[in-house]
Amino acid sequence: MSMKYLMLLFAAMIIRSFADSGNAIETTLPEITNATTDIPAIRLCGPEGDGYCLHGDCIHARDIDGMYCRCSHGYTGIRCQHVVLVDYQRSEKPNTTTSYIPSPGIVLVLVGIIMCCLLSVYRFTRRTKLPIQDMVVP
């Protein structure tokens, strides 16, 4: 991957975060500029990009000739044409029924380990006699 492509992806993520927060207006989006010129490296597409992205915003990069899409939540693809599967979206939020299932299993394993330890201590103390017990005469 070239450095310019990585910069394009990073800038698209920054622009997306501003747009998702509801604070961004097209004229107030941050512009990443090259040190030698004042032409923005990434800008929103003009009228030529209308309808290019099916479910998202069109971005035009100066260094990479072409239009790219910044997809809305729930969509993916080159032109944001694919819907993200429901199972994938569900996996972002923990499901309450599946998050409590491991709890009884963990408790049972811990109880089993404690019982094994107590049983081994009991057997060990039963087999060995302390010297004090030999000295006591009935």
Curated annotation (Swiss-Prot):
Alphabetized UniProt keyword annotations: Disulfide bond, Early protein, EGF-like domain, Glycoprotein, Growth factor, Secreted, Signal
Induction remarks: Expressed in the early phase of the viral replicative cycle.
InterPro entries in alphabetical order: EGF-like_dom, GF_C11R
Domain of life: Viruses
Subcellular location: Secreted
Family: Belongs to the orthopoxvirus OPG019 family.
Name used for this protein in its record: Growth factor
Protein's gene: OPG019
